Amino acid sequence: MLVLLSSVWLLTTSSSAQVEPAPAEGALTTLGTLKSKKITESSGLARSHFIEDAWWTMNDSGHGTAVYMFGDKGQTIADCNLKNAKNRDWEAMASFQRDGKNYLLVADVGDNVSRRERCQLYIFEEPKFKPKKKKSYSKKLKATRLEFRYEDGPRNCEAVACVPDGESVFLIEKIFLETNKRRHPGIYELKLPPLKPPLNEDEDGQDEENTMLVAKRIASFPFRGVTGMSISPNGKRLVIRNYLSAHLFERVAVDGKLPTWEQVFRDSKPKSVPMPLQVQGEAICFTRDNNHLIVTSETARQTIWKVNVASQQESQDDVHQEEPTTTNGIEQSATPLKTTEAQ
């Protein structure tokens, strides 16, 4: 949802949080500007399985049920609609593969007042097509609707990510102010059931009665104001962002065995990955090479940024060892960044 520019500074670290700085060399890169007038609140991002350097996005609540694919220069490649979906408060997207098929997920999980007893995930096969230079691909897509609730009551959420094989979805609640009930935002895991075919069928059909799924709290996250999350294609990196920065978790094998994400959240410290300063930066997504991030903002004609997660400035070592400053009782942190233009 739209917020005042000043509110991006009301962020979100806990003074007790410890963050390891990411390796330092390199800079942010601007790729282009989203050209579509229809994309005014890019709230989520999902990597395309079929087209390199292309991503799917969608608008926040109040903008219908369209999903858009754009290229690295900001050009619109596809403009599709989910014909059997509703946009109560869409906040995130993800992509995954399952049973030899390529899927996209749209998460209707926004709940600013934390009153929703059930939320929805819309899952559909990514359409495969040959892009055209002067005309965007358009099709009505049918999605499978999954309904879920949180085990400990309604939660506001803007960050959702799916593991590459589509077995689990992770969600993080968005909290600005500390409360007596929960100091840190919860990280939740939702196990996905087998997907019911057919998806993207041309005929209209009635949704079967859905079994209510339950998202279980598996860990806490030491930073507030979370707006986006993504898992790398190889399943070894997970990034969580807020309006000013991002935090990178990595699965490192021990005795030849990778830990679960629950173990990583519990036992490891995230590395800091600063974000470009945006009016309302929310969406984030890994690229195919597992080493870069694409980030957008909830404003019209926003800049598309590319971030190298393995290349940040050495000065962060000192920045993240300092105590965060506080404004109006809300702790905040900001890191100046060097940027470069893509050639």
Predicted regions, residues:
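Bacterial N-terminal signal peptides
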Residues: 1-9
